[in-house]
Amino acid sequence: MAIDKETRIIDDIMEKIIAKTMHPGEKLSSENKLAEKYNVSRITARNALTTLEARGYIYSVQGKGRFLKETSKPIQLHLTGSTSFTDKMKQAGYHLTTKNMYCTKINYDSTVYDALQADLEAEVYKIGRLRLIDNEPIAIHQSFVNQALFPDIAQNGPQILSMFAYYRQLGYEEFKSKQSLLSITFPTSYEQELLSCGSMVPLIVLETGCIDVKTEKVLEYTKIIYRSDKFKYDITTDESR
């Protein structure tokens, strides 16, 4: 299948980025030069550059042009296991900060309620936290918990930064994950704002659950949204390797 010229421009620039023949801060060819080189209209050249900008590879400076964005070294993240995200990042030596964004009661959602093994009449709360490394937003964590199991969650939820730490305060000590599901999506306008990313930066969505090992109680249903350009994902099942 023939590749259209806009895609060819994108691919050629991406090859240079991957091969590191272009360096952060280096200026890209102008729309006019690209249009001339590939024998296309300026609009086609502009669309190619706009796509690269939306994907987070380049940035524009009004009146000066477009430049290659500096990228941070990807963070290696083990997606499963019994260690909290906070502990994983601290153990790896990263400067992690967490902002509690909300604690709200949700309407009935069959996926959430089934995962929590909650009754139809149960009150379920969603606690959202924004994760930042070196003050750069990298993930949104959403924890869904049943008030029947945590009667004070409406009062405590707005202050929670680590769910595992909260569970330990209540006497739960050892945790394991439920079935984990991975999917890919693109950010909504709200997620773009929170994660400081463009509309075409793919997001990795991890849906899982947390179970107390001793009692086998389902403590929470978890939905985590990661910026795909900030992590390398370790999916090895044996975390003690």
Per-region residue spans from a language model:
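Extreme N-terminal segment that seeds HTH/winged-HTH DNA-binding domains in transcriptional regulators
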Residues: 1-42
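Beta-hairpin "wing" of winged helix-turn-helix
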Residues: 54-63, 69
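C-terminal all-alpha effector/ligand-binding and dimerization domain
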Residues: 97-241
